[in-house]
Amino acid sequence: MASSDETIFDLPPYIRSRKTPFFPLCFPSLNDPETGVSWKDVPISSQVSVRIYLPKITDHEKGEKLPILVYVHGAGFCLESAFKSFFHTYVKHFVTEAKAIVVSVEFRLAPEHHLPSAYEDCWEALQWVASHVGLDTSSLKTSIDKDPWIINYGDFERLYLWGDSTGANIVHNILIRAGKEKLKGGVKILGAILYYPYFLIRTSSKQSDYMENEYRSYWKLAYPNAPGGNDNLMINPTAENGPDLRGYGCSRLLVSMVADEARDITLLYIDALERSGWKGELDVADFEGDYFEIFSPDTELGKNKLRRSTSFIR
């Protein structure tokens, strides 16, 4: 009889299928030679793990509390990983520039796990982070599922969410939920960063047709039985009887867009948010090209976009 952890299919380095859930976690890496950032992988449940990043802490900075960001990567709900090298490098540079703790979520992907699995996984990760509030290092003796970096350095008065593309869509839906449900310990989300948020909103622009078709294809793959289809409230915040954006669960928001086919969609989302009566602070960043900060971080545009987002953290 096969053991429960047996590999039943292996096509290295791309696919490995096991009989039980498995996370290919890395050993902790301390003081990255390029950035000084430390990171480690932490499983928080049988379905979800996170990679936690800590900036270099000098002797005179010990005891200083740092902002906490929960990061959700993009790629159509069905591709990539929080552990992918380009996301990893991107987050390291962000951590260095922002001087913040980042918790990057490794969530389940479609089509193996249809939505709303990813939404639930990221909410679970956020609640896990919130569960550290008010703890000290003595709690680690009885709470093996808690992380000392978050306890020792995390400032829960400065908790942010951050996502790009479909990751930004997940963050948007978390903000809707956080406006209705409490986080553990009464923790509040201060702000959120939405880079190129992924929505299905009908526009009158012919330029948006291609992007809308592509977005619809990914949505159908990720959530084939979505109630309301393309007008599901999770993907179309402007739909009839849509979500109450007035209740967004944060007080500050940075929305980034670029001059591409999705720009009109983002503008309609921003308009809906402004008309909703949400009382928070809205900051809009308009750039020339997308994903330079991830795929070309050493270019001037990539650096400018990184600085723009990290300057939002305070």
Swiss-Prot record:
Q: Name one GO biological process term.
A: alkaloid metabolic process
- Catalytic center at which residues? 165, 260
- State the SUPFAM superfamilies in the record: alpha/beta-Hydrolases (SSF53474)
Q: Write the record's keywords in alphabetical order, separated by commas.
A: Alkaloid metabolism, Lyase
Instruction: State the pathway, as annotated in the record.
Output: Alkaloid biosynthesis
- Fetch the Pfam families from UniProt: Abhydrolase_3 (PF07859)
Q: Where along the sequence does the record place the motif called Involved in the stabilization of the negatively charged intermediate by the formation of the oxyanion hole?
A: 73-75
The enzyme's E.C. designation: 4.-.-.-
Entry keyword annotation includes Lyase: yes
**What InterPro entries is this protein classified in?**
AB_hydrolase_3, AB_hydrolase_fold, Carboxylest/Gibb_receptor
Give an example GO molecular function: lyase activity
Q: What's this protein's family per the entry?
A: Belongs to the 'GDXG' lipolytic enzyme family.
The job of this chain, per UniProt, is described as: Component of the seco-iridoid and derivatives monoterpenoid indole alkaloids (MIAs, e.g. vincadifformine) biosynthesis pathway. Catalyzes the conversion of O-acetylstemmadenine (OAS) to vincadifformine. May also trigger the formation of additional unknown MIAs.
Q: What name has this protein been given in UniProt? A: Hydrolase 4
Which species does the entry assign this protein to? Catharanthus roseus (Madagascar periwinkle)
